[in-house]
Amino acid sequence: LNHIKRVEKIIDNVLNKLESDEEFIYKEKIACILHDTGAVLGKENHAYRSYLFAKDYFINNDIKFDDINLILDAIKNHSDGFETDNLYGIILIFADKLDMTKERLSYYGKKVKGNKEYSHVNDIDITIENNNLKINFITDGEVNLKEINEYYFTKKIFKGVESFSNKLDLKYILLMDNKEWKI
């Protein structure tokens, strides 16, 4: 639940900075709330299970709105759909991948090489001005850059930022403690 709240906060922050309309933000938050419901049975194939849950939920509760299929597609493809043309999808991917701070890590996650380096990330600052996106990972100064850069999920974070930026025609830079971060 905390992950969902943090992803929702990123979505709200970013979409307000982009001056998105309230209806779009509302629908994006629906995708956010439902995107990991399938993870209760494990991470493997959780995006597809989340999609099935959301689809059944909408049908069983007679929830209908235009672009509901785009919301369902965003949920279904949020794990690896980096090449999507679905704006809901790319925003969900972006926000979901960016939620990698010490708050997200489980006890066991802190023991995994590479992943444990995110336990040193205290916050993420996102700035959007004049078509420039700046993402600054604020740490306690103890991050092992070699380990974090080699970790598979770091590549997903960078890919999510790149895809989001390309879709919205933004120039982007990732920073760690105000220094450019490249992998």
Task: Report each predicted region and the residues it spans.
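N-terminal low-complexity or amphipathic/hydrophobic leaders
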Residues: 6, 10-14
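Terminal helices and disordered tails flanking the catalytic cores of nucleotide-processing hydrolases
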Residues: 99-183
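Divalent metal-dependent catalytic cores for phosphoryl transfer on phosphate-bearing substrates
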Residues: 3, 16-128
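Residue-level marker of positions within ordered structural domains that often coincide
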Residues: 12, 80, 166
